[in-house]
Swiss-Prot record:
It comes from Rattus norvegicus (Rat). The keyword Metal-binding applies. Belongs to the RRN7/TAF1B family. InterPro entries: Rrn7_cyclin_C, Rrn7_cyclin_N, TAF1B/Rrn7, TF_Rrn7_Zf. Interacts with FLNA (via N-terminus). Component of the transcription factor SL1/TIF-IB complex, composed of TBP and at least TAF1A, TAF1B, TAF1C and TAF1D. In the complex interacts directly with TBP, TAF1A and TAF1C. Interaction of the SL1/TIF-IB subunits with TBP excludes interaction of TBP with the transcription factor IID (TFIID) subunits. Interacts with TBP and RRN3. Part of Pol I pre-initiation complex (PIC), in which Pol I core assembles with RRN3 and promoter-bound UTBF and SL1/TIF-IB complex. The gene is Taf1b. A zinc finger (RRN7-type) spans 5-39. This is TATA box-binding protein-associated factor RNA polymerase I subunit B.
Length: 586
């Protein structure tokens, strides 16, 4: 290869902006940094085999690298479809029925594409006058093969004038066409990344990464699976479900840069309230019908969830009878109350896991009052009884339970905070503003990895912690190596008294978490300030809010709403008395 010929070509590489050229056997210039091959060529004469004969083919390896570097033409909706596919696959490995991916989630996603006019409609949204092949009514098979075959041809309510294929063959995803130099986007790796981020239409609900989780939870709710929203978010934290920087699951040929970063790069943990709000918005946008009924034999029924969380926080199983009574008295166990109906005139939404925990908190207040006085008095009586009746079933000792739970809770929270602090947000696949910055981004990433290796060598390699199998329970009290006492079999005998054939709580007092509910347009039900409540009440709220990954104020609000249902008469009397006081003042 003539060095002078390479020096004569001083153009910058269109992929990495470097000026470092070599000549292929075919005589074309290629970038030695990123292996991008240009159209400009130089006639090269090879005398290795036959004198004065020009080689007409490039080596197979270099051609594959060139194809790999250029990537595919892909659309934003394909990116979200890829994320949804991998999220559904992850849920299936966690024990969810395959029907969730193949039927329910597929139908919801197909419906979304139709409602947002991206596919399955007569006039899909076009991109810059370019023919959007991936959005044609008659979808063709693609180079992706079976990897992202999430979309199938199951029935979906069509728009007026829309036509669909009715064959029941294998699912057909959007085709991913090879990237051409003319259609390559300078500002984004995707074809429509810029236009998608700037698209603003009234009534349009743009897909986001948090809304992919909302779609997954809607599918779980439709299937009535044994995974609550708090469980789903916890599995995301444990990196069992793709969410943080979800573009990591994209094939290498799907280049992500520029505007794609704002669409697919998520560098924050999912928030319960945010995902729940997105779930409702997506369900309303899709115009989904009433969901399957949540009956008493379903996992999401408050009676079932109450038993689950009683075992989770090491409380006596006898409390289950009291939680069932509260569920019955408040009416939160009725089918119509629990079942999600997005198109109803009065859309009622239920946070099943938060509601069940609120029932347990209310029962604890009924038993112990939780005023930092009565619970300790009952603990003294239980301790004295247990010392004199060691062979009998022990009575529940609130003080002992508090000590065990505080130690376990503090240790669990410490490990959780350490895991969050050590979490690596940056991926091995760096993001960059444009293809011009690619080489710089990769060099920076390589430098960071080298520094990390050097620091690891200096401080010594920490032993790898074995990853535990996924479980619905975060705390285990029945295992052999727990090292903590289990209170599941303890009795509530000292806390209940018989009245006829019924048992009532020995404690006859109760304090309301909220005396007056806000009626302003801010829609805040109540406020929560720790200084206004007892330490034992704060401790219990902190435990449950940590297990559910929610704010303490959100759980306090749910407890207040439940109390309003249970003590409706008391609230009405308080309301009338406040009105009479206002009259007397005037």
């Amino acid at each position: 290869m003539d060095v002078e010929q390479m020096k004569a070509f001083t153009d910058r590489c269109s992929q990495c902006a470097a000026v470092s050229w070599g000549l292929t056997d075919e005589g074309k210039y290629y970038c030695t940094s990123c292996h991008n091959v240009t159209d400009r060529s130089e006639e090269v004469v090879s005398t290795a085999v036959i004198p004065n004969t020009k080689i007409n083919s490039i080596s197979r390896g270099l051609r594959q690298r060139s194809k790999h570097e250029k990537g595919w033409d892909w659309y934003v909706c394909e990116g979200f479809q890829c994320i949804l596919y991998h999220q559904a696959e992850a849920l299936e490995t966690l024990g969810v029925s395959p029907e969730l991916k193949n039927e329910v989630l597929h139908s919801f996603w197909k419906r979304y594409l139709q409602k947002s006019k991206q596919a399955y409609c007569k006039n899909p949204v076009r991109t810059s006058g370019r023919k959007a092949k991936v959005l044609e009514d008659n979808l063709q098979s693609s180079d992706w093969g079976s990897d992202f075959e999430l979309l199938s041809d199951t029935t979906c309510p069509p728009e007026s004038g829309a036509e669909f294929q009715s064959d029941s063959q294998t699912p057909k995803p959007f085709p991913a066409t090879k990237r051409s130099s003319k259609s390559a986007s300078v500002c984004s790796g995707s074809v429509d990344g810029v236009e998608y981020s700037e698209r603003k239409e009234k009534g349009l609900l743009k897909m986001t990464v948090p809304r992919t989780l909302a779609l997954c939870y809607l599918s779980l709710l439709w299937q009535r699976e044994t995974i609550t929203l708090s469980d789903l978010l916890r599995f995301v934290e444990e990196d069992r479900i793709p969410y943080i920087n979800a573009f990591k699951v994209f094939p290498e040929e799907m280049k992500v840069y520029g505007r794609d970063k704002g669409i697919f790069a998520v560098e924050s943990w999912p928030d319960y309230e945010d995902i729940y709000k997105n779930m409702i918005e997506v369900a309303v946008f899709l115009d989904l019908p009433r969901f399957p009924d949540i009956t008493e034999d379903c996992y999401l029924h408050p009676n079932t969830l109450c038993m689950k969380y009683l075992l989770e926080v090491n409380l006596p199983e006898e409390m289950y009878t009291l939680t069932c009574q509260v569920v019955k008295l408040t009416g939160i166990g009725e089918v119509d109350f629990l079942t999600f109906d997005p198109i109803a005139k009065m859309t009622r939404t239920v946070k099943h896991d938060v509601q069940a925990v609120a029932v347990i908190v209310l029962v604890l207040k009924l038993l112990f009052l939780l005023d930092d006085k009565l619970e300790w008095s009952y603990s003294d009586l239980a301790e004295a009884y247990n010392e004199g009746h060691k062979e009998e079933t022990p009575q529940f000792d609130f003080r002992k339970w508090y000590q065990v739970m505080k130690k376990t809770f503090d240790e669990k929270r410490r490990k959780w905070e350490e895991a969050r602090a050590k979490y690596v947000w940056k991926t091995k696949r760096p993001l960059y503003r444009s293809h011009i910055d690619k080489s710089v981004a990769y060099k920076r990433r390589e430098m960071v990895e080298n520094l990390q290796k050097q620091f690891s060598a200096l401080i010594g390699s920490a032993p790898e912690v074995e990853r535990q199998a996924p479980s619905s329970f975060q705390l285990n009290w029945t295992g052999e190596d727990t090292g903590s006492p289990c209170f599941h079999g303890h009795s509530l005998q000292g806390l209940l008294i018989s009245k006829g054939q019924a048992l009532i709580t020995k404690n006859s007092l109760y304090w309301l978490s909220t005396h007056k509910f806000c009626k302003s347009y801010c829609k805040h039900v109540t406020t929560y300030e720790e200084s206004n409540f007892s330490l034992s009440y704060q401790f219990i709220l902190n435990i449950f809010s940590f297990l559910l990954r929610i704010k303490t104020s959100a759980l306090h609000e749910e407890v207040s709403l439940l109390e309003k249902k249970l003590f409706e008469k008391k609230y009405n009397e308080s309301k009338r008395s406040s009105r009479s006081k206002k009259v007397r003042r005037h």
